[in-house]
Amino acid sequence: MLDYDDAMTSSTSSGERAPDPRPARTRAAIFTAARELSADDGEVTVNALAKRAGVSRAAFYSHFTGLDDLLGAMLQEMFDAAWERGRADGAAGYTIVHHVQHGYAMMAAYIERHHAFLRGALDWKSSHRTYMILTGTMAALHVEALKRMPDRLPPRPGIEALARSLTGGELVHADHWLVATEEAARAGEELDATELLEVMLATAPSWYIGLGPDEPIPAAELLASARTYGEDAADQH
């Protein structure tokens, strides 16, 4: 089994102490095990995760307090990628509505890429706390975008309420898409989230996404860009 001693360090040829890579490997193994168990319809428990990852229960608990914490960390990958994409877009001089459109595309690309894990995660024995972490983090992304478009904001409600409403819409459409594509996924078909992205953008306020009701929605183009950017944290773990 993998060693979980996070405090260990290793010596380099120059005599300096380098961070021990074992904790990162343990964390990566747990992430992979969670994705595989979810995709295989296996029951996701700490015991099952530890066995699949080849680590001890103690190793699991040295990284995560429980399934809630693990699921939150895995979902956080997507948001970290979204924040990074936002910084890159800002540095490149993109407008705020361009950033918003790509934020939705990042969400759709993540769901498309990890649909098996996310579909399985719906059945995890996690608590309401996980849902609150998810919605809170998603809402924070919308808050940052809304703050950067003061001239576009409606007179009411406030930014926080708007962000929660936008988040709720995203989650409803994502959940519906996961359920609607379940049969195709089980048949081994390659899924395409272009329609999901188009629906999310079509139902978002036009003042927020910068597209009028009659304007074409470049969902395929946006999703293609998001796919290449976020071959994302999943490949880093």
Where are these regions (language model features)?
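Short, hydrophobic secondary-structure boundary micro-motifs
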Residues: 119-121, 186
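Basic, helix-initiating cap at the start of DNA-binding domains
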Residues: 2-43, 48
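Amphipathic alpha-helical packing segments from all-alpha helical-bundle domains
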Residues: 126-152, 157-172, 195
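A short secondary-structure junction motif
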Residues: 37, 77-85, 89, 114, ...
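Hydrophobic alpha-helical connector segments
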Residues: 87-116, 127
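Helix-turn-helix
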Residues: 37-69, 73
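Alpha-helical structural segments
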Residues: 25-36, 52, 69-89, 102, ...
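C-terminal peripheral helix-coil segments that are non-catalytic and often amphipathic
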Residues: 2-11, 143, 147, 179-237
